[in-house]
Regions:
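Conserved catalytic core of nucleotide polymerization and phosphodiester-bond processing enzymes
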Residues: 1-141
Length: 141
């Protein structure tokens, strides 16, 4: 952690400001505006307060990632439907979208996954995606 904070010196200040802002207004938000209330930040119990601080630090990042994967999921589903493909979006695992595709569609399905996942939001730093295929989930990893 110390090496990480030394490499990215502004993160510590950002985290402290995020906690202070959350304590003042009672919530944190994702980049898409989804709010998470954090009454734990005002607890007299140290453990509960520390838990609230962890949630305040993590929610803007992990919550935004959850928002992004949901947007990508909708975009992939629509593309598969609009292109009348047999491929189906069947599962999400954290930041993964799992698509079941006939072999004849595997390459096109992979292209759609990459395009829609990388193109669903525009940030200063582009999102990149790894796409893997296999006969089963284990083989694809």
């Amino acid at each position: 952690l110390q090496t990480y904070l030394a490499t990215f010196p502004n993160i510590d200040g950002y985290m402290e400001k995020t906690i202070a802002d959350a304590r003042q207004c009672g919530y944190v938000s994702t980049l898409f505006g989804r709010r998470r209330a954090l009454p734990e930040l005002n607890s007299n119990n140290h453990n509960i307060r520390a838990s609230g601080e962890r949630m305040a630090r993590n929610t803007p990042i992990q919550g935004t990632a959850a928002d992004v994967i949901k947007l990508a999921m909708v975009r992939v589903w629509r593309r598969l439907r609009d292109e009348k493909m047999e491929s189906r979006l069947i599962l999400t695992v954290h930041d993964e979208l799992i698509v079941e595709a006939p072999e004849a569609e595997a390459e096109k399905a992979a292209q759609i996954l990459r395009e829609e996942m990388e193109g669903c939001v525009q940030y200063a730093v582009p999102l990149s995606t790894d796409v893997h295929a296999g006969k089963n989930w284990l083989e694809a990893h």
